[in-house]
């Protein structure tokens, strides 16, 4: 049974989160959590929370056994960017894009 968990508008760019997502794709859930625990990136914490949510969803909604679960799919899409202005010299201004991302984790016991 496939179970999905999503984190929308995560405050990190999709490019940075994809680096972490690639580490756990296809792994067993226990191994993926261990990998994320020792990954020294902000995105690892975001992905870990979504993975734990997917595990809880599978256990509660589908009655799945945690030991059989695998990360079948994990993908990161770009979310909306917040536009900000950085004042510069001589009355100019630069645009700052604070990027967000949508993290989706799918776990399955197959």
From Swiss-Prot:
It comes from the Bacteria. CDD domains: Ribosomal_L22. One of its GO terms (biological process) is translation. One of its GO terms (molecular function) is rRNA binding. Keywords: Ribonucleoprotein, Ribosomal protein, RNA-binding, rRNA-binding. SUPFAM superfamilies: Ribosomal protein L22. Belongs to the universal ribosomal protein uL22 family. This protein binds specifically to 23S rRNA; its binding is stimulated by other ribosomal proteins, e.g. L4, L17, and L20. It is important during the early stages of 50S assembly. It makes multiple contacts with different domains of the 23S rRNA in the assembled 50S subunit and ribosome. The globular domain of the protein is located near the polypeptide exit tunnel on the outside of the subunit, while an extended beta-hairpin is found that lines the wall of the exit tunnel in the center of the 70S ribosome. Part of the 50S ribosomal subunit. PANTHER family: CHLOROPLAST 50S RIBOSOMAL PROTEIN L22-RELATED (PTHR13501), LARGE RIBOSOMAL SUBUNIT PROTEIN UL22M (PTHR13501:SF8). This is Large ribosomal subunit protein uL22. It comes from Yersinia enterocolitica serotype O:8 / biotype 1B (strain NCTC 13174 / 8081). The lineage of its organism: Bacteria, Pseudomonadati, Pseudomonadota, Gammaproteobacteria, Enterobacterales.
């Amino acid at each position: 049974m496939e179970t999905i968990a999503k984190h929308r508008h995560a405050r990190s760019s999709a490019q940075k989160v994809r680096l972490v997502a690639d580490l756990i794709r296809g792994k067993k859930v226990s191994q993926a959590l261990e990998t994320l625990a020792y990954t020294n990136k902000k995105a690892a914490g975001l992905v870990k929370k979504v993975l734990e949510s997917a595990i809880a969803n599978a256990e509660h909604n589908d009655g799945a056994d945690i030991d059989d679960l695998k990360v079948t799919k994990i993908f990161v899409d770009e979310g909306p960017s917040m536009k900000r202005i950085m004042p510069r010299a001589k009355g100019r201004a630069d645009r700052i894009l604070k990027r967000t991302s949508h993290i989706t984790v799918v776990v399955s016991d197959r």
